[in-house]
Amino acid sequence: MPYYWGAILIGGVFLAGCTQNQETTTTQSGSKENVIKVGLLVDLSGGLATYGNNEKHICEIAEEKINKYFEEKGMPYKVKLYVEDTRADPNICLQKVQALHAQGITFFLGPMASGEVKNIKGFINSNKIVIISPSSTAPPQMLGFRTPEEKKYVFRFVPTDNFQGNAIGDVAKQLGLKNVIVIYRKDAWGDGLERATVEKLKANGINIIDEIPYDPNIGDWSPIIQTTTNKIAGKGNDTGVIFIGYEEVATLLSQIDDNSPLLKHVWIGCDGTANSKKVLEEAKNKAVKVKLYSTMFQSETDEAEKIKEEFKKRGYGEPDQYALNVYDAFWVGAISYAEMLNKTGGKYDADLLSKLIKENTVKYSEGQFGVKSVTGYIKLNEWNDRASGNYGIFAVTEDGWKLVGVWDSTTGKINWK
């Protein structure tokens, strides 16, 4: 922590009024403690539930550590999480944001899906709410942002799908595919990733047999299955299926006949399918057959191993990359919010908070606050999105999901494990 700020806080000079978005409580020692409310928008029961539950659990761990940090530094703050299940539904997400904002919450972690970000951006900007999403990856233009200024309250600690599209295209090439059928989720995120992926596939000389969109609320996959089966008929091993969507891929696979020719071809997924628990629970045998090679942003430090170990000890299993992203986001957001309150005498200032998050992301990455990043150096571009990153390639095996390779964003090469 910068000395000048820490000295003010530790020296007891800090004075803060109670604003709508914070509560003031009295500790056992009689000192005043300002509670910073943090909204957590995650999918706990929808198409991204595997990742949403991971984010909830890791934020609970972060909440404990941040509060301990504030206490040890003599800083009169405490963060308090307000968790809401959005089901990755844009309309539900907006309702949750509005409800939490009515409770005075002005800083949010999430939401997870790009369609959600797109749907709440108007409310975010008009009410000057600041958010950090760990997993929204659609390019800004696909979300309706025309300039970086319009997106100054929306941060994303993950690279956009311009990177992931390249990764998927290179995976297809490395696997020897010459022809592909692309099945994609018809929403802001799916459209963006599909466009970026197809562009890279074509650049790699891969023929696009068909591009098949599906409704995010789909239940019966039989029309998609029939169309894909007809398109792939008579094709050899150099033909594959690319699925751009969420964990509903498990339902799709489960509805495919055991003897279907679709299960004789390689499938490639994305970050919406990588490490999905639902896939293992509902369609593991079929997923093993098609491999379901899935890409996900990959950036971990030695510090991440400590958090992952604690995550496992609590019975939560293995945290995914987006859980690690939101862990870092919570730290940066909490430190920045506290600094904002210190600078304003306890008042909320969205423009200052936005500025501090951008600055403190660098300081946090460099360890200036005495806390180590779990996802490595976080460099943000002019749109407040993570500027670069490698992608892990995961596949379904008899032993579950396994990391089988890493795509290097600087070289475009894949290091297969």
Swiss-Prot record:
Xref: InterPro entries: BCAA_transport, Leu-bd, Peripla_BP_I
SUPFAM superfamilies, A to Z: Periplasmic binding protein-like I (SSF53822)
Query: Is Signal there in the keyword field?
Result: yes
Which Pfam families does the UniProt record give? Peripla_BP_6 (PF13458)
**Signal peptide start and end residues:** 1-21
Q: Which UniProt keywords apply?
A: Signal
Q: Which PANTHER family match?
A: HISTIDINE KINASE, LEUCINE-SPECIFIC-BINDING PROTEIN
Full protein name:
Uncharacterized protein MJ1266
